[in-house]
Swiss-Prot record:
Keyword Isomerase listed: no
Protein's UniProt name: ATP synthase subunit a
Topology term for the membrane: Multi-pass membrane protein
SUPFAM superfamilies attached to this UniProt entry: F1F0 ATP synthase subunit A (SSF81336)
TM region(s), chain numbering: 50-70, 107-127, 141-161, 194-214, 218-238, 239-259
GO biological process: proton motive force-driven plasma membrane ATP synthesis
GO CC list: plasma membrane; proton-transporting ATP synthase complex
Location of this chain's protein in the cell: Cell membrane
Family statement drawn from the similarity comment of this UniProt entry: Belongs to the ATPase A chain family.
Molecular function terms from GO: proton-transporting ATP synthase activity, rotational mechanism
């Protein structure tokens, strides 16, 4: 396939998905269907769609946190509090077993926040005409950059400058090349893994919902859409868990000696 033919096919698919989004736009908000609209601020191109979805996600996270803590009761916790306690204990088992008590206590709030934010961000795209912030690679690269900063911060704190730099020369000095390649690949793979799974899920959901819209009848569009929506909910949780666990593993790799003292 030539480059021109590939571009034409991509444009055709884009137009089809755009048409589906327009037909499903029961919010009647033009901004939610303008894929190509950007804000240009100080030389930067900013997607208002992604920004608004990010604000909505943050609001949902804050609302969830408020619901979990508004009526704290040790003896008879509410449903939101009980859900959060189960989540905290589950993730806490992973954090403290890999990072130890001291580093685990420092990382625990960050890991839980990562998980909750990514879950809400992933699931937001399952609502027709809305989109997941994590379906934008700029968001996932931003999250990956935070992980990289955490890795080096805790690595320097645990091992000092000399020990942290010396990590790149282990077990032999020539391995520094491999470690540097790994350093570049780590945030790239972390970002694209999350972005690719969520973006692909959104595209397929739009296609399946489009089948309903073009009179494919109940068994032609509705049932596959419901099945894929259920699977997408599962994928949304799994990808949040994978991102959180990889963050734990990467921090543990650079601050390993703290994990030995739990």
């Amino acid at each position: 396939m030539s480059a021109a033919a590939g571009a034409a096919q991509a444009a055709e698919h884009h137009d089809m998905l755009h048409m589906v989004e327009m037909d499903l736009n029961f919010w009647n908000i033009p901004l939610f269907t303008e894929y190509d609209k950007y804000w240009h601020i100080m030389g930067l191109s900013i997607s208002p769609r992604t920004m608004i979805m990010t604000w909505i996600t943050m609001a949902l996270v804050l609302l969830f946190a408020w619901a979990c803590t508004k009526n704290q009761n040790v003896r008879s916790p509410g449903k939101a509090q009980a859900t959060f306690e189960v989540l905290w204990e589950f993730l806490g088992g992973q954090v403290f077993s890999n990072l130890g008590n001291k580093l685990g206590a420092a990382m625990m709030p960050i890991i839980v926040t990562f998980f909750i934010y990514i879950v809400f961000a992933n699931l937001l795209g399952l609502i027709p005409t809305l989109s997941s912030p994590t379906a934008d690679k700029n968001t996932t690269f931003g999250l990956a950059l935070i992980v990289v900063l955490l890795i080096h911060y805790h690595g320097l704190k645990a091992n000092g400058v000399g020990g942290h730099i010396g990590h790149y020369f282990q077990p032999f000095k020539p391995f520094v090349v491999i470690h540097l390649i790994e350093e570049i690949a780590r945030p790239v793979t972390l970002a694209f893994r999350l972005y690719g799974n969520i973006f692909a899920g959104e595209v397929l959901i739009a296609v399946l919902l489009g089948l309903i819209n073009i009179n494919a009848y109940v068994f032609g569009g509705f049932i596959p859409s419901v099945i894929w929506l259920a699977f997408s909910v599962f994928v949304g949780f799994v990808q949040a868990f994978v991102f959180s666990m990889l963050t734990i593993a990467y921090v543990s790799q650079f601050a390993a000696h703290e994990a030995d003292h739990h």
